[in-house]
Amino acid sequence: MSAAQGWDRNRRRGGGAAGGASGVSGAGAAGGGRGTGQLNRFVQLSGRPHLPGKKKIRWDPVRRRFIQSCPIIRIPNRFLRGHRPPPARSGHRCVADNTNLYVFGGYNPDYDESGGPDNEDYPLFRELWRYHFATGVWHQMGTDGYMPRELASMSLVLHGNNLLVFGGTGIPFGESNGNDVHVCNVKYKRWALLSCRGKRPSRIYGQAMALINGSLYVFGGTTGYIYSTDLHKLDLNTMVWTQLKPNNLSCDLPEERYRHEIAHDGQRIYILGGGTSWTAYSLNKIHAYNLETNAWEEIATKPHEKIGFPAARRCHSCVQIKNDVFICGGYNGEVILGDIWKLNLQTFQWVKLPATMPEPVYFHCAAVTPAGCMYIHGGVVNIHENKRTGSLFKIWLVVPSLLELAWEKLLAAFPNLANLSRTQLLHLGLTQELIERLK
């Protein structure tokens, strides 16, 4: 069967992995238009921060600004100095630590945008990028070992210095799926394949994955033809896969789906949204898997006063800060969404944030730093033109600590701080933790 035939059959039967021409009628297209709604204001960073005058900084007004407006900050390409930024893409994944945003994989059918003859894996991106927060520099990481070829709608989590990648699909979508766990140590820049035993998941993409108490949990996904409601667990100590069999009747299980997201509180795994090529699931009620009772539960959430519930969606992003879960963007089957919502896992109360994404997207990726700053990258921004973006945005989801506010002011005042030696930085009074953020 030719690749073209594979794509055609996938349009009819399965879900797209990264948003494509099939997305209007299939699962995972990405949609169009630019949102004009905004918070109080969007802040666009200049090419290089200027050196401010010696003016005393008053922190209280700065903190109030974050509380009231939750500003979304666009990081334009001209600020990403030193290296070219990643080409526009969709279906990729990202994670973040205190120092870097790591972006893996992705898809773009536009030959020129995806690198033309220089991209041997067109229309996919077999590459790992790092965005350094302190300097605003993108860097394509050179790595050793075998980098996986399933580069769209895979799952990605960060475990210490290791990126854990599971599943995903190559081209044609649904014909070259994976079910291996690949590990990349970002410190030593080396890939390895985990040798696992037991009942592993099918070869799928669009599944959701979480790291809980030393185990990976994988739920849902699609083969490209069949959607799944299976739940698997990989114990990272024994490297044994187990297919969990919940104590429920089949009618009480969550609907089969892909491109959903999951959150957890250590006791339950919560399924947020997702869908199939013909539907997107509601967020009014969510399913939760109880790790202690081995059973699925259905939880009714509470609507935002005067606004109601968030729209049903798939292909959105989700990050978590303690018991607060934030979802943004996505596609509801008709339009691309640009809203941001918060769900508290103790009260199950939905709150709509006052921010609106400058570019409504789906099939994008998002990650949150330990300090509470979310970064959003890429995605599809126009359904009819099948257009992707390479934009990078950030938004503080919590009030930044005094340390974080001072750190951002310091970086703005001294943009070449990263060029100083460790000894010089210590003499300036920087802590070891902050020095590590510069390297």
Curated annotation (Swiss-Prot):
GO cellular component, one term: Cul2-RING ubiquitin ligase complex
InterPro entries in the record: Kelch-typ_b-propeller (IPR015915), Kelch_1 (IPR006652), KLHDC10 (IPR052125)
Disordered as annotated region, ranges: 1-50
Annotated metabolic or biological route of this protein: Protein modification; protein ubiquitination
GO molecular function: ubiquitin-like ligase-substrate adaptor activity
An annotated GO BP: rescue of stalled ribosome
Region (Interaction with CUL2): 398-439
Family: Belongs to the KLHDC10 family.
Protein name, as recorded: Kelch domain-containing protein 10
Species name: Mus musculus
Taxonomic lineage: Eukaryota, Metazoa, Chordata, Craniata, Vertebrata
